[in-house]
C-alpha cells in the first residue's frame, strides 16, 4: 500500500479539510457515518478482487466493522472550529482521537503557535500521528493543510514539520497553503507570520501548493456569479483542486501520478518548490447546459490568470515545469494536440534549460461536485500545477508589507513577549530576499 496521511492545522486547514473529506466521501460513495453505499460496496468488492490493493485505501482505513475512517488528523490550539466537526454532519466519520484541540488559541501570533502554546500539544499530535502511521502498510507521505497568515497555521505547522522531518525523514511532505491575499487580510500581522513560517518550513517541505483567498473569491464572484462568496464557497472550489491532485492516488487510471512524482517533476531545485495552481472549467450550474468544454478549451483556460488560484500574472514569468492533471472524458491524442497548441503560443514561455516541461496525468473518473454547490457538473476538468518564476511577484508583495511594519517595529512586542528575538525576524527576512533572488536567477538564460 502507498498510504497518505492528511494533517489539517488551524482554522483554514480544518475548514478546507472538512470540505475535502466531504468531497472524497461523495467520490467514493462513503456515507457520513463511514459506511460504503450498497451500490459502491459491490463495485468495491469487484475492485478488490481485481486489485488486491484498491487505491481507495490510500486515504481511508477500513475497520473490522467495515467502516471507512479517513487517514487524517485535525489540529487546532483552540476548540471552536474543531467543535464544528465534532457536532457536524461528518461527526461519525472521524475517530475522536483524530480531532485534537487545545484550550487557548495562538491569537494570530507565530510565536505562540510555535513556542509557548504550540509546545504544549506537539507531543500529543506526534503520538496521534504515529498511531495513524502504524496503521499504514507503506506510508508514502504527508499532505499538510494550513494558512501562512494565522498563528497556528504558521507557528505550530513549522514546529510540527521540523519534528516530522526528524521522525519521518524519508517521507514526502506536500503542503496546501493559503497564502495572504493582496487586498483581503484576516490579520494585521499576516506578513510577519508568513515570512517567519516560510523561512522555518522551507527545508522541511518538498512541495507547497499555494492558494490565495482573493484569487478564489474573484473566481467565485466573476465566473460563478456568487455575489458575496462565503468561506464555504471558496473552500469548495479549493477542494476541487485538492481532489484533482489526489485523484491519481485514490483511483486507478491509465496515466496516474504518484505523490513523489509531483516533487520529481515540479521541483527543479529544492528551494524552488512553490507551484501555482489553476483549475478549469469553472462554470456555474445555470451556464453549464449551454457550453461544451473541449480538452483544448480547458487547457487554454488554465494558462489564463483568471483561472489561477494565486494573484500573479503568469505572462511576467517563465515556466520551469508544468503538470496537467485531467479528469473524465479525456484521451491522450486530444491532450497532445492541446499541449502542442499551447507551446506554439508566445504567451507561454519556458526557461531555456527546460524546453519540454509538461507532465500529464489522466484519470478517467469525471469530477464530482457538491450537491447544492455553485459549481456545475462537467464531463472533464483539468488542474494545472505550474512552477513558474511569476510567483516571485507574490513573494515581493509579502516582503514589502513585512518591511513597512518592521521599519516601525510595529506589533513586534507581541512576538518578543513570547520569547522570540529580533534576530529571528532579520534571518527570516534575509532568507526570503534570497528566495526572490533564487527565482530571478533560474529565470535567466545561461
UniProtKB/Swiss-Prot annotation:
Presence of the UniProt keyword Chloroplast in the record: no
Keywords, ordered alphabetically: Cytoplasm, Cytoskeleton, GTP-binding, Hydrolase, Magnesium, Metal-binding, Microtubule, Nucleotide-binding
Catalysed reactions, semicolon-separated: GTP + H2O = GDP + phosphate + H(+)
UniProt-listed GO biological process terms: microtubule cytoskeleton organization; mitotic cell cycle
MREC motif, short sequence motif: residues: 1-4
GO molecular function terms attached to this record: GTP binding; hydrolase activity; metal ion binding; structural constituent of cytoskeleton
Cofactor: Mg(2+)
Pfam families for this protein: Tubulin (PF00091), Tubulin_C (PF03953)
EC number: 3.6.5.-
Active site as annotated: 261
Single GO cellular component term: cytoplasm
Main location: cytoplasm
UniProt keyword Nucleotide-binding present: yes
Binding residue positions for Mg(2+): 78
EC category name: hydrolase
UniProt subcellular location: Cytoplasm, Cytoskeleton
Recorded domain comment: The MREC motif may be critical for tubulin autoregulation.
PANTHER family: TUBULIN
Record function comment: Tubulin is the major constituent of microtubules, a cylinder consisting of laterally associated linear protofilaments composed of alpha- and beta-tubulin heterodimers. Microtubules grow by the addition of GTP-tubulin dimers to the microtubule end, where a stabilizing cap forms. Below the cap, tubulin dimers are in GDP-bound state, owing to GTPase activity of alpha-tubulin.
Family affiliation: Belongs to the tubulin family.
Subunit text: Dimer of alpha and beta chains. A typical microtubule is a hollow water-filled tube with an outer diameter of 25 nm and an inner diameter of 15 nM. Alpha-beta heterodimers associate head-to-tail to form protofilaments running lengthwise along the microtubule wall with the beta-tubulin subunit facing the microtubule plus end conferring a structural polarity. Microtubules usually have 13 protofilaments but different protofilament numbers can be found in some organisms and specialized cells.
Protein's name in the database: Tubulin alpha chain-like 3
